[in-house]
Amino acid sequence: MALSTRIQAACLLLLLLASLSSGAYLRQQTRQTTALQPWHGAESKTDDSALLMLKRRKRDTNFPICLFCCKCCKNSSCGLCCIT
């Protein structure tokens, strides 16, 4: 029983050490990545503006801008009304 408790304690200690070392390694990698990419902040600003453009409402297609051709212009095959 004492041997299994020691093994469990050793495994727990190894897990704690591994999690601490991986956390420190990830923080170091994050700092290096940030230092290598100073333009990242500008890129995120353009991404934000692109998201705003996507969120804009589109024109309601039930109300067309142009009407069908009423033959008001010389080009009768245009299909659109040039008055509107």
From Swiss-Prot:
Keyword Chaperone: no
Binding partners and assembly: Interacts with SLC40A1; this interaction promotes SLC40A1 rapid ubiquitination.
GO cellular component, one term: extracellular region
One GO term of the biological process aspect: acute-phase response
Removed propeptide positions: 24-54
Annotated protein name in UniProt: Hepcidin
Disulfide bond entries: 66-82, 69-72, 70-78, 73-81
Molecular function GO terms recorded: copper ion binding; hormone activity; transporter regulator activity
Function: Liver-produced hormone that constitutes the main circulating regulator of iron absorption and distribution across tissues. Acts by promoting endocytosis and degradation of ferroportin/SLC40A1, leading to the retention of iron in iron-exporting cells and decreased flow of iron into plasma. Controls the major flows of iron into plasma: absorption of dietary iron in the intestine, recycling of iron by macrophages, which phagocytose old erythrocytes and other cells, and mobilization of stored iron from hepatocytes.
Family statement: Belongs to the hepcidin family.
Record-linked Pfam families: Hepcidin
Keywords: Antibiotic, Antimicrobial, Cleavage on pair of basic residues, Disulfide bond, Hormone, Secreted, Signal
Signal peptide (UniProt feature, chain positions): 1-23
Subcellular location: Secreted
Organism: Rattus norvegicus
